Every structure is written in C-alpha cells, then in structure tokens.
Amino acid sequence: MPSQKFENLLNLALETSMEERDKSLELNVGYEREDNTWELIVKYHGDLRQGMSSFFALPQRRLLQIEELIAGYAIMTVPESFVDALALVEEIEYIEKPKRLFFETLQGKLASCIVPGSQLGTTLRGQGVLVAVIDSGIAWRNQDFRNTDGTSRILYLWDQTLQAGQIRERAVESGLFTGENSIDYAPPDGFYSGVEFNQAQINAALNASSEIEGNLLVPSLDTSGHGTAVAGIAAGNGGTSGDVYAGVAPESELIIVKLGTPRANSFPRTTELMRALTYIVRKSLELRRPVAINLSFGNTYGSHNGTSLLERFIDNVSEIGRNVICVGSGNEGASGGHTGGSVGITSNTTAGTSTGMASGASNTLVELIVGNYESGLNVQLWKDYVDRYRIRLISPAGESFTVDTDKAGKQTYVLEQTRILLYNGEPAPYLTSQEIYFDFLPLENRSYINSGVWTFELEGIKTITGNYTFYLPSETVRSEQTRFVRPTPDVTLTIPSTASKVITVGAYHAALEAYADFSGRGYLYQDRLGGRIEGSFIKPDLAAPGVGIIAPTRAGTYEPVTGTSFATPFVTGAAALLMQWGIVDGNDQYLYGEKVKAYLRKGANPIRGEREYPNERVGYGALCVSASLPG
C-alpha cells in the first residue's frame, strides 16, 4: 500500500514488478538486484540509529547501512523487505529514491573581467581558499594541478567508483606495497564506498619510479575528461601552457570527488552527490578554510521549485561553514523536453469549493513526438493540486484512455504495444503541487515503445490557476527525435540548480556577446506551481562564458569545450577570489554564501540583446569579477 511518507516515484517503484522496472529509465535507480536492496534518501529528526534499532535484530541486518550526512539527512541501504516498515519509524520524516545525474556537456577570463596584471591577475589568485570539484574525476598528473616544485595541489581525492578491497589486492599482487610502503585503501570516515587519497599519497604516486607504479598507488582515472576540464577552468594554473590557459583561481588548493559508483555502465546518482557535499563541507571545517564548490550536472525529474530532498539538503549545506555552491543551469534550453501553459480558469468557482462551469477553460492538446527505437520513456505532468483536470492519453494509432484522476496511486494501461504505468500523486509535506507520472514501457514481446505522435488532452473541470507543466528525461537518454511538438524553453534549468541558495549559472557566447540558446532557463516574477515566485528567488543568478572554452584535457593538452558545465567553474573560481579578498586577506570575514551571490549579481555586466535584468535567460547578466569586488 502506498505510503505518504514516500515520494511518488518510490511508491510506484515498490508497486511495480522487477521485470517492468528493468525496462524503465527511472524506476530501478537505487535498486541493487544482487543484494535485493534499495538505496534511499532519508530526512529525519532525533536519533535515527536508535529509531532503527529493531531493524538491526532482523536476519538481513548485514545488508542494512546508515550513512548520516548533515542537517538531518541520511542515506540508507536497506533490503527491499524492510522498506515498507521504514514508514513506521517515527524519526523518519520523508523518503525519496535516488535520481540519475547527467553531466551538462555540449577567451572566458577576459570576458569575465579577470585581467592579467590587475589585482585579480596578481594578488587575487585563490590563495588560502579551497576549490572543490564534484565531477568525473581529475587527471591528477596534469601540470595544471601541480605546484612549481612538482607537488600536487590536490589535498584530497575521493574516487567513489573504486573498491578498496580490489585495489588492495592489486597492490599486494604487484609486490610494491610491503612494510612501510603499504597503503591502507579505504573510504573516507563515515562512508562505505570508494577510496580516499590524500596529498601525500598523490605526491608519492607522482614521484614513483614509473607511471605504471604511480597508477598502482593512485588508480583513479578521469575517463571522460569532463572533471579535468571543469577543474582546469576553475583552478588550473596553466602549467602546461605557460600560464596562457590558467584558470580563474590558479593558486587555490583542490578537493576532488569523482562522482559515481562501482556499478558498470551506470550514471551517477543524487545520493552520491549528497555524500560528496557532506564530505567536502566536513573537510572545509576540519581545515578551517573557505570552500567554493562546483557542480556541473543535473537532471530533469522534479517540480523544479526547490522542494525535493536534494534541493533542500543543498540549501542546508550552504549554511554550514563558509562555502559557496555553484551549479550549472543545464543544457536543456533547446532540447524540446519541456512544455507548459494553462488550460484556463473555470468560472463561478471559489478556491477549494464548488465546481462551476468552464467559461475560461478549454481543451488543451499537448503533443509529444516519440522517435524510433525508444526502449522506454517517462513523462512528468505537474499541476496545482487544487485544479481538477480530465486527462486523456491518445496513442499514435488513435487508441486512448482517460486517467482516473479521483484514484490516487498506481494505474496501468495498454495502448497499442506499449504499457503505461501511471502514478497519480498527492501533495507531500514539502510540496503543494501534484505530479502525474507516466512511464512508457514496451510489452513483453517488444523491445521498443510505439513511435509517432502521442497526445495528452487536458480539460479543466475546476481550475483555480489552470497552470500545467510537462518534463521529459534529459536529452542525454532519449533520441534526438523525441521531443514536444510545441516546447517551451522557460523553466528548463536542471535540478539541483533550482535550489534557492546555490549560485545558478547560465551560459553565454562571449565572442558573440549573446545568450547561448542551449542554456537552461529559469523563472522570474512569474506564476509557478505553489503561487508567485518571491522577488528574491530568481534563476539563473548570472551567466558566464560557455561556448568554445579552452580547457585542459586528461592527455595534458588543451581543447575547446562547450556547455553550462564549463560556464559554472568561471563562477566557482570567481567565488574563490572573492572569499580570498574577504576572508583570507581580512577585508570581510563574512564574504561567503549568499553575500558572494549578491556581490556577483551586483557586478554583472549587460549582454547584447538582453533588455531587462534580471531575466530568465541570464539572470543579472554576465559575470564580471572586478566589478563584483567591494570598493
């Protein structure tokens, strides 16, 4: 039976067979078939372990893990047979399953007012500030991340994808690590996964007699090069280029988290991001140093209004210690994965009471093109809970069903050769809007869902706001042809850039001085689910160069990269410079968090073609660090 303590997606997953979950892009995220366990995000109060004490007496207790994070959040790994009982634990307030994260990949320093020879190019170089990059790892041998004496600028590297036991076995087999040379490979304190390397271990690997020996000492690789490029833009020293391609904060020291899991062929999860943020903030507090944190990835699942556990967790993290968290707005602006509008407002209605006649409301058709060879697809429909709709889904061949909107929970339908799992959600303790979730799966004898134009017909029965919005999965996991016929680019920023207290970064083309159309758009003084947006809740906050940015590669060279992934580290590096000026240099001990955001907003430059500021494309304008410094 569905629990109101569980999010909609978790309820649907638990009510769906393993065979059907395997066909879904989303429902099995967090489930481990080998152990029959779920990884879950938990919001709790009080003593969680005490509240869970009875579970540790059960036969399957060996599979139970609790990782307490910060601010009343935890990640739990539990046998599937335990999950329903979690709803009875008084200390647990709410539970969500993980979501997948996608890297946002598709002459910035001068455009961002960081001029060589100025104060920003000489005295402000990130000294005394930590730059933390949560990404695909780093090419730790690269000269861009080493001091002039050859030692590493990386203080800590946590590779979440490595397994300590396997690395230890290889080390023993190699014959290199005996006696005083042995290394105790282990996760960071308080965590169960991955391997942590410190600066001394990285330096030992750099000084090894051969590259092979060094790679045995620190077997962490950035296989995509994404994290290396991001770290280079934020904090590389341009060592391979003679400082020509130095990053924004080239004398900062680094904390790197390679996001992921030992599972093969899998995307990173939101749970791994939450672990990474907890780890970095704890290190910052331990080292008593300010930290600028860079996140260059996101996903499209959620209401996009800052209410998910991940978004609220990040807002809580931003208030611990002296940190700034910078997040890219994503590359979904022109992907066709979002649409929205209004079915109109019915007449003779009083909020929460009578139904009335629909004079202002009308039937609305939302058409979705599904490309060939889609093995599965999910669609989110978000609406105001007070509004009542009649919703009909029509297949490409004209078959249809009408959603039973009076029945909460799971519903199952079949149109043509496609099974549709539907979950009619309810409000949650942290969410006033309603989600209706559709998961399109091929029938047992097919590999793909039906292609063609699928139509959602919306009819307002009693509508107070009439607003609706649809989201598809990230363009990374759907075919190029799959998109809405009439997409809307607004509110296409990805989660977690929707968190209130992060600095959300869009991208612009510095050479053309123009907004980059792929950059995820936000919202500004407009109606959205749950009411009007507060004036202070504006996304994105500003934009940075994100097209053709020269960045270091894992091979030790440089190449151009494009995407909000590579706009974000400009702002992360800028935050490090402001915190150096304020905290390290003693000009303002309180220059972190929202104060850095305010200064960067105030110093932003106009962008060609943008008439009003702030706006939903570039926020307050283009990053300009020199104008953001006080005085």
Model-derived features with residue positions:
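Subtilisin-like serine protease catalytic core
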Residues: 119-271, 288-289, 320-322, 374-377, ...
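Catalytic cores of secreted or luminal carbohydrate-active enzymes
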Residues: 293, 310-352, 619-625
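C-terminal subdomain of the subtilisin-like protease fold in secreted/lumenal serine endopeptidases
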Residues: 30, 286, 290-299, 306, ...
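Short acidic, glycine-rich surface-loop motifs adjacent to enzyme active sites
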Residues: 98, 154, 257-259, 277-305, ...
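Edge beta-strands of jelly-roll/beta-sandwich modules across compartments, strongly enriched
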Residues: 436, 463-475
